[in-house]
Amino acid sequence: MARAVHRSGLVALGIATALMASCAFAAKDVVVAVGSNFTTLDPYDANDTLSQAVAKSFYQGLFGLDKEMKLKNVLAESYTVSDDGITYTVKLREGIKFQDGTDFNAAAVKANLDRASDPANHLKRYNLYKNIAKTEAIDPTTVKITLKQPFSAFINILVHPATAMISPAALEKYGKEIGFHPVGTGPYELDTWNQTDFVKVKKFAGYWQPGLPKLDSITWRPVADNNTRAAMLQTGEAQFAFPIPYEQAALLEKNKNIELMASPSIMQRYISMNVTQKPFDNPKVREALNYAINRPALVKVAFAGYATPATGVVPPSIAYAQSYKPWPYDPVKARELLKEAGYPNGFSTTLWSSHNHSTAQKVLQFTQQQLAQVGIKAQVTAMDAGQRAAEVEGKGQKESGVRMFYTGWSASTGEADWALSPLFASQNWPPTLFNTAFYSNKQVDDFLAQALKTNDPAEKTRLYKAAQDIIWQESPWIPLVVEKLVSAHSKNLTGFWIMPDTGFSFEDADLQ
């Protein structure tokens, strides 16, 4: 009898051990290898897309964008706009709580927008919210936002990933340190942030959408080296990696356990020319440089085919984008124009890049060689984030050393104003925003301003087209390509993908 009991105990112990092992094995933990580090977990104070993308683990906005860049409701159920375009009334979902137990309601929305629109807080994304005059909590599920002047793209500001809802209790508790203590309504909550190595998030048990999230944890791990990032997928150290270096794409595609994804993007790559400085103040010089670049060849050499030549200054999937006939490659025409402009022997200049990764280096080298063929000697410099902030974003027109500048822009609102105004409006020269061409045209300024005062889609189309027509003709840029976004993931990971603005969508992610 004693022996029988002993055997039963052993059987029970074996079953328990097996169950524990099974549970441990079944833990759904995902590692995501990304290309750079995170600056902050406060979306309102982050200028980089990656930090805002990771912050979506904890945070949600009132509205968002789907994979087709169409508006969708998130924490909001609906909205209305007054006839004069000044007042936005937003109805909120009921019964949602922040991860610290605080109710999500109209008062929480007010706390966030009051903080964002107060210049005294010196938040990096203040320019998105500076047109808010006041935010009122009408009742627990109704918010009224009054603008200083009509701004028809305002709903797209609420779509922007910066417009996240942070627990007002956490804002009060942590103040300026909120970037280290994220508390939102999202599917995951912070587990660990090792600022030099990784951010780990864990499932939020109180998440408001039934059955989600399906993963137990996500570890966001910065891996600067392209080859290491790709290797981590092959060894199983990571289940998702972005960006995938183009030179590694073909190799990963052959791996039966990995799926390679090339998705559309709104990431436009271009070279701005400082039109306030010689020789770029001459339209013929700018035209010549556009003829000097072989864009189809650039797509092959620098992007391994994962891009398309630019057909405008706004990517095609952005609302109100206009497409034009691409600049043909014509070095003979380029040399003729340079001669007409007074530079028969070309000139010397500088070409800076906002990034120093391998693709940027290839673009710089290719462009340098192309310009040399028409007599232009370009000294190239690939900058890191610190150099870019100091030398480009932090200096005004008089002290700026920018001449030619290779960079990119992703209009995360999905609407043409954010694709045009920060880059071409006269008031947005650095250090205000990112008009690194120091371009100024009163007609363009007027068209962009008028487009924000109307809610009539036909009128907005007319005004944005008029602005883009002028910009395309005056050529303060060399528009290069619109990138495709290349990511890769383990085939047993589903529901995890890259959005066109280079953010991540992972709410439905699961390990099979």
Swiss-Prot record:
GO BP terms, alphabetized: dipeptide transport
Gene: gsiB
Record-level Gene Ontology MF annotations: peptide transmembrane transporter activity
Similarity comment: family membership: Belongs to the bacterial solute-binding protein 5 family.
Domain of life: Bacteria
Listed transmembrane segments: none
Record's function text: Part of the ABC transporter complex GsiABCD involved in glutathione import. Binds glutathione.
Subunit structure: The complex is composed of two ATP-binding proteins (GsiA), two transmembrane proteins (GsiC and GsiD) and a solute-binding protein (GsiB).
Gene3D superfamilies given in the database record: Dipeptide-binding Protein, Domain 1, Dipeptide-binding Protein, Domain 3, Periplasmic binding protein-like II
Signal peptide range: 1-26
Keyword field: Periplasm, Signal, Transport
Protein name, UniProt field: Glutathione-binding protein GsiB
A Pfam family matched in the record: SBP_bac_5
Annotated localization: Periplasm
GO cellular component, one term: outer membrane-bounded periplasmic space
PROSITE patterns, alphabetized: SBP_BACTERIAL_5
Origin species: Shigella boydii serotype 4 (strain Sb227)
